[in-house]
């Protein structure tokens, strides 16, 4: 699950800079995040929208596996950027404290992976991204040492 931290780096800086740090709302925010991920219509709409993107994703994946100069980040953003930004905006709407970004990433990666597997018979190999994402995670932690989850995972 360490790879989850790397999923939405671009959105993270935007989110962290403007969201509220009110701890009293933490449980409410977590409940809203879970509700969003468990909303079947949300996922059905998302996968319908992304269906046309899968050919591009598969092409990038194959190129990367063959030693192309394309970084895993390109593949990931092709697949996940719209969803990551959408959910980041959701966190902002509910004034999520920035330490919930870890929760957001873990939920995002877990649910997205499971639902992609459900929707597609051929699942891209996410394992090829792990080393790259762990590196990015450590870089992120160095810049944002307040995150206890990142601190533990980067040890």
Question: At which residue positions do the language-model features occur?
Answer:
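Charged, low-complexity surface segments at secondary-structure and domain boundaries
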Residues: 31, 62, 116-118
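Membrane-proximal alpha-helical anchors
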Residues: 1-59
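An amphipathic alpha-helical interaction surface
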Residues: 71-155
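A contiguous binding-surface segment within folded domains or other stable secondary-structure elements
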Residues: 53-83
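Long amphipathic alpha-helical segments that form oligomerization/scaffold cores
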Residues: 34-64, 125-143, 147-149
């Amino acid at each position: 699950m360490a790879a989850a931290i790397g999923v939405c780096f671009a959105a993270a800086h935007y989110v962290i800079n403007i969201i509220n740090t009110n701890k009293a709302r933490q449980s409410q925010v977590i409940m809203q995040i879970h509700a969003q991920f468990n909303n079947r219509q949300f996922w059905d709409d998302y996968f319908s929208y992304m269906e046309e993107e899968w050919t591009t994703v598969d092409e990038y994946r194959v190129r990367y596996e063959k030693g192309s100069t394309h970084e895993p980040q390109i593949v990931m953003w092709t697949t996940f950027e719209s969803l990551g930004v959408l959910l980041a905006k959701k966190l902002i709407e509910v004034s999520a404290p920035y330490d919930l970004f870890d929760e957001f990433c873990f939920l995002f990666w877990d649910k997205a992976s499971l639902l992609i597997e459900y929707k597609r018979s051929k699942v891209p190999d996410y394992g090829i991204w792990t080393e790259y994402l762990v590196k990015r995670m450590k870089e992120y932690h160095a810049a944002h040492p307040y995150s206890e989850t990142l601190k533990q995972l980067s040890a």
